[in-house]
């Protein structure tokens, strides 16, 4: 079941935004090092989708050693740039302790942020909420509101 959820959350369909992206072209051919090189250049220029895509390479271990901590860091960078699917994936990573410690407050907060930015993160939100006390829920909502104001969208 967990693998099915991972597939849905981190599906290849949501991996890339532009079909004409040169990195995506290399990725489809299995040329992961070429895709990584292109995305690294774009990420160095602050491109959120490139940052996110690098994170997913590390999440799945495509062309790099699988490293959930590195994946988490890239995902968080993209999430802070306003990329809703990165916000959703970050919420998932907090929920399950993938690349970071389990943190239901952050999971709930990031799912709220993703929802605010148009991503359907309701399932993650509901799963995180089960683990929250009323005080923790209030903290998560405050955190989400603070982050929404800080994120450049």
Locations of the language-model features?
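N-terminal signal peptide c-region/cleavage motif recognized by signal peptidases
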Residues: 12-14
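Hydrophobic face of amphipathic alpha-helices that form TPR/SEL1-like repeat modules
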Residues: 20-27, 38, 42, 53-60, ...
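Short helix-capping/linker turns of helical repeat alpha-solenoids
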Residues: 27, 31, 44-48, 60-62, ...
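Terminal, low-structured helical/coil segments at or just beyond the last alpha-helical repeat
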Residues: 120-153
